[in-house]
């Protein structure tokens, strides 16, 4: 694969290009998955690992004390401070009109703050169209927003969409999962990739264990289930090593409990995974 920088310079998606540029600038292909249940835990962990990641993945609906002002706004401030994209792991799976409102409206208003989200392919192309509509409507409403908040961020060029960037959001399709017994394999994975081709501007890539072979599109591949120590858990999660997933075409490794579970030091572990991910990338691209 070409380098992150080379891909960013020619990428069809302005959003994907910004992600690749940030990865290259920070020298980190690590996404921290912060599956915690309180705002305090989420914000504290995000602040600790923020300098070492390109992205933070959330499950915002498991936050017991969620409020938009108390949870989302501090998280957005940390994204600007440390330079990372926000990825709400919502796994949308309904018809187009429903997912549009799940994405844009309700308590969480995901489209307002989450740079990237994901969806199952089961409902067909309607789910992509619905989420795109939610993104376009939200971004259109935000065009009038004051961007002065970004002025003091050294990561402004990566995090702030250009004026002509119509979507300013990205969607990942769930092509493969890391849990034991997953049905997202084989023909299902192939059909999901075909669905993504219906809108390569908005669908920027996949949650997958491998890069699609022989595909001419430059998809972003994000891989969960990455661990340097553990092999799995009692609930079916299976872990692969950093070098293993990078060798099969991953762009960004997703690590959760490996950073903060079992009384681990999240700062030291984030540094460790950042180093491992970047070294594995350099081995492939040197």
Curated annotation (Swiss-Prot):
Assigned EC number: 4.1.1.23
Top-rank taxon: Eukaryota
CDD domains: OMP_decarboxylase_like
Active site (catalytic residues): 91 (proton donor)
Positions with a binding annotation for substrate: 35, 57-59, 89-98, 239, 257
Record has Transmembrane as a keyword: no
Disulfide bonds: none
Alphabetical list of Pfam families matching this protein: OMPdecase
SMART domains from the UniProt entry: OMPdecase
One of the record's GO cellular component terms: cytosol
Listed GO biological process terms: 'de novo' pyrimidine nucleobase biosynthetic process; 'de novo' UMP biosynthetic process
KW Transcription regulation (keyword) present: no
Keyword list, A-Z: Decarboxylase, Lyase, Pyrimidine biosynthesis
Pathway info: Pyrimidine metabolism; UMP biosynthesis via de novo pathway; UMP from orotate: step 2/2
PROSITE patterns: OMPDECASE
Alphabetized GO MF terms: orotidine-5'-phosphate decarboxylase activity
InterPro entries: Aldolase_TIM, OMPdecase, OMPdecase_AS, OMPdeCOase_dom, RibuloseP-bd_barrel
Enzymatic reactions: orotidine 5'-phosphate + H(+) = UMP + CO2
Listed PANTHER family: OROTIDINE 5'-PHOSPHATE DECARBOXYLASE
Family: Belongs to the OMP decarboxylase family.
Name this polypeptide is given: Orotidine 5'-phosphate decarboxylase
Annotated organism of origin: Yarrowia lipolytica (strain CLIB 122 / E 150) (Yeast)
